A protein has these predicted regions:
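Thr-Gly-centered strand-to-loop micro-motif
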Residues: 110-111, 131-133, 153, 185
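Binuclear metal-dependent hydrolase catalytic cores
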Residues: 1-131, 140, 197-218
């Protein structure tokens, strides 16, 4: 979740989205920003209805065309010409290749990475970059990341995987970008316990965890 000038924005809403919001005591939410259309990243969208009710407004949803196609399929009742009371109310905004504004004078820059053959979006905001579900990243897209001070990147496990960075690939990418700090996310149960992971990581690289808070400039 990004907390910017008193407003909260989440990147992706997976199956445990509702529980995450309750645990972190999130009272308001300005927007949901999607990286891609896989179920573990979109299946919590229905639960924005609680914020609709509490804040008396539509939820801003940012997604590219391929994600919007999936949302229309999975949540057809949200987009139907005739709807029933209580459905989630969303205001969908299309992510193109250019940077876009999510708060006053605050923009996100989309970064295309490849999740095997599926394009997935990472995002840069100021000196912070978040990337999930990456297996390869083009040199052109890497240029958007250079200069990042805080890098969040996926590292599924130690052994190779078809569509995700493993530990070796993630560490190689981190070394190439050379941020001040890097955090590993999208870690599977096949990896190890957090303390054991941290024990073998290079300096200034850490395993992320639920509830972790990272200050950054935007």
């Amino acid at each position: 979740m990004l907390s910017l000038d008193g407003e909260n924005h989440v990147i992706d809403a997976g199956p445990d989205f509702r529980n995450q919001m309750l645990i972190e005591k999130v009272k308001t939410l300005k927007s949901v920003i999607f990286t891609h259309e896989h179920k573990d990243h979109i299946s919590g969208l229905d639960d924005v209805r609680a914020f609709n009710f509490k804040e008396k407004r539509e939820m801003n949803v940012y997604a590219n065309a391929q994600v919007q196609f999936a949302l229309h399929r999975e949540y057809h009742y949200i987009f139907a010409a005739k709807t029933y009371p209580g459905i989630p109310k969303i205001n969908i905004q299309t992510i193109e290749k250019e940077s876009f504004e999510i708060a006053n004078n605050t923009t996100l820059t989309p970064i295309e990475v490849m999740h095997y053959k599926l394009p997935v979006l990472g995002f840069r905001i100021g000196d912070f970059t978040y990337i999930t579900d990456a297996k390869t990243i083009s040199e052109k897209e890497k240029e958007k990341i250079k200069g990042t001070k805080i890098l969040i990147v996926n590292a599924l496990r130690k052994t190779p995987h078809l569509s995700h960075f493993n530990l070796e690939e993630a560490l190689s990418f981190i070394a190439e970008i050379a941020p001040e700090k890097a955090y590993l996310t999208h870690i599977s149960h096949l990896f190890d316990k957090h303390d054991n992971i941290n024990a073998v990581l290079p300096e200034r690289v850490y395993a992320a965890f639920d509830g972790l808070q990272i200050p950054f400039n935007y």
